[in-house]
Amino acid sequence: MKFFLDTANVEKIKEFNALGLVDGVTTNPSLIKKEGRDFYEVIKEICSIVDGPVSAEVIALDSEGMVKEARELVKLAENVVVKIPMTKEGMKAVNILSKEGIKTNVTLIFSANQALLAAKAGASYVSPFVGRLDDVGQDGMFLISEVMQVFGAYGIETEVIVASVRHPIHVLESAKMGADIATIPFDVLDKLFNHPLTDNGIAKFLSDWEAHMNR
């Protein structure tokens, strides 16, 4: 499974990229707003750091506006993927862009039907939001299992990005279900490193070594 970093924080991207853990990056207007920098400047810098896909989201709500923005975004770098919302206008834009060879990531997916529609429209990626479904009392990971089942049954090549990841269990369950990608906030990715028995083991090794050296 590929790991995308869900952030626009350039320093965090550099940190995890240096570990060989970043296969791509997803951003959205809210994440870029947190950085307090120019939208295009941030996307361009991220694309220069990461070799893999970098998702940048359009702001327009009409298909014509989305297509216009998308064509500008892909001029920034070869690895830009255009993020499009799951709406009728969005799917119209995806269909146009796919015919132009522009890769798209359809975001705000909350049902398998929506994922299927996006794939049929020509999306390169779909992003089901698991954490937000959990927030309203639904099982976010069940959606992933449904999407993987449908895509597998028909050999659909659109890749599934598990989004709105809130904790390490989301990542593990995504991997067990065979999801192509999990896009992970850096604080959640940090938690994947941790286990109390690892810490205890390191402490024991150091203690034993110090005791040995002090004999």
UniProtKB/Swiss-Prot annotation:
EC number(s) per UniProt?
2.2.1.2
Reaction equations catalysed: D-sedoheptulose 7-phosphate + D-glyceraldehyde 3-phosphate = D-erythrose 4-phosphate + beta-D-fructose 6-phosphate
> Which Gene3D superfamilies did the record assign?
Aldolase class I (3.20.20.70)
| MF (Gene Ontology) | aldehyde-lyase activity; transaldolase activity
Any one GO cellular component localisation term in the record: cytoplasm
Q: Which UniProt keywords apply?
A: Cytoplasm, Pentose shunt, Schiff base, Transferase
Q: What InterPro entries does UniProt report for this protein, alphabetically?
A: Aldolase_TIM, TAL/FSA, Transaldolase_3B, Transaldolase_3B/F6P_aldolase, Transaldolase_AS, TSA/FSA_arc/bac
An example Gene Ontology biological process:
carbohydrate metabolic process
- Whether Metal-binding counts among this entry's keywords is no
What PROSITE patterns would the database entry show?
A: TRANSALDOLASE_1
Q: Which pathway is it part of? A: Carbohydrate degradation; pentose phosphate pathway; D-glyceraldehyde 3-phosphate and beta-D-fructose 6-phosphate from D-ribose 5-phosphate and D-xylulose 5-phosphate (non-oxidative stage): step 2/3
Q: Where's the active site on this chain?
A: 83 (schiff-base intermediate with substrate)
Q: Where is the signal peptide?
A: none
Where does the record place it? Answer: Cytoplasm
Please list the coiled coil stretches. none
Q: Which domain of life is it from?
A: Archaea
Residues annotated as transmembrane: none
| Family of this protein | Belongs to the transaldolase family. Type 3B subfamily.
Q: What does this protein do?
A: Transaldolase is important for the balance of metabolites in the pentose-phosphate pathway.
Cite the HAMAP family for this sequence: Transaldolase_3b
Q: Which PANTHER family match?
A: FRUCTOSE-6-PHOSPHATE ALDOLASE 1-RELATED (PTHR10683:SF40), TRANSALDOLASE (PTHR10683)
Entry protein name: Probable transaldolase
Whichever gene encodes this chain, its name is tal
